[in-house]
Amino acid sequence: MNETLSGVVTRVTGATYIVETGDGPKVRCRTVPSTVSENEGSNLVAVGDRVEFRPKASETEMAEGVIVRVEERRSVLERRREVRRNRSKEKEQVIAANIDQIVLITSFDDPPFNSRLVDRYLVFAESEHLPLLIVVNKIDLDEEGMVEEDLEVYRNLDCNICLVSAEDGRGIEELRELLRDRLSAFSGHSGVGKSTLINLLVGREELRTAETSGKTGKGVHTTTSSAMFQLPGGGYVIDTPGIREFNLAGITRENLRFYYTEFLRFMPECAFSSCSHTVEPGCAVIAAVESGRIDAERYESYLALLDSLDE
């Protein structure tokens, strides 16, 4: 069997990759030392990768193959992972490839809405030129509409926002439309209802779910590997593991300011072209914060994220 076929990786479990060709059966594939990749660094294969594979004889009911080439990725979602033999080092891990948009699942409560997490994703999405859809789940717990206070700043930034309830179905059809004909990477902290929402959207119980831990108030992780699912009516979703440390690859103390888009119109007025918008005299961004033209919480978020970046 020397012919090669093309397909998309829909699941990654360890060193095993499930590839789908469209109309054909799923194929269980592995890589070999001669596998060629057009992507430098990070892991060789990720969910969403387009690959060429060579079928091989199988002793099981499921077809098997060998991946011979991984095509260049249009976009990636990454996180950092520790290199076990030397925990002082980290390596980038691609957990989703060739995505059209990032869908950040948050919740009104249990766990509470986390604006700092939203800001990290906004920075990443801006840096990767990817749209971010902010989904707020569990709005059935928000009888007084309190979440709108948290969302006002993001609405003012023209962010895409969808309010849903996996419990009573509110907003699910609107969310379907926002996902139609796109490859969307679902991400977010555990406990926000990500797996429950995917099960609703896909129309079958594909993923395990878990409630928030009563002891810690934090979610219990149920996703341990990435997987891609087709949506009825068009589109695909990639379920990604809970990201404990979202990787802002390429974001530095020098360029972070460019990804807080509300800063951009004030930056040319700063006294110094290299202004970090922290302590410099004549900073137009700080003046805009003081006058209320830039949201103070967003500015504090910028300072916190700036401090977390390597020198």
From Swiss-Prot:
PROSITE patterns listed in its UniProt record: ENGC_GTPASE, G_CP
Superkingdom, natural source: Bacteria
Record GO terms (molecular function): GTP binding; GTPase activity; metal ion binding; rRNA binding
SUPFAM superfamilies, per database record: P-loop containing nucleoside triphosphate hydrolases
GO process annotations (BP): ribosomal small subunit biogenesis
Residues the record lists as binding Zn(2+): C270, C275, H277, C283
Gene3D superfamilies (UniProt xref): Nucleic acid-binding proteins, P-loop containing nucleotide triphosphate hydrolases, Probable gtpase engc, domain 3
Location in the cell: Cytoplasm
Residues that, per the record, bind GTP: N137, K138, I139, D140, G188, H189, S190, G191, V192, G193, K194, S195, T196
Entry EC no(s): 3.6.1.-
Family: Belongs to the TRAFAC class YlqF/YawG GTPase family. RsgA subfamily.
Job description of the protein: One of several proteins that assist in the late maturation steps of the functional core of the 30S ribosomal subunit. Helps release RbfA from mature subunits. May play a role in the assembly of ribosomal proteins into the subunit. Circularly permuted GTPase that catalyzes slow GTP hydrolysis, GTPase activity is stimulated by the 30S ribosomal subunit.
NCBIfam families: ribosome small subunit-dependent GTPase A
Entry protein name: Small ribosomal subunit biogenesis GTPase RsgA
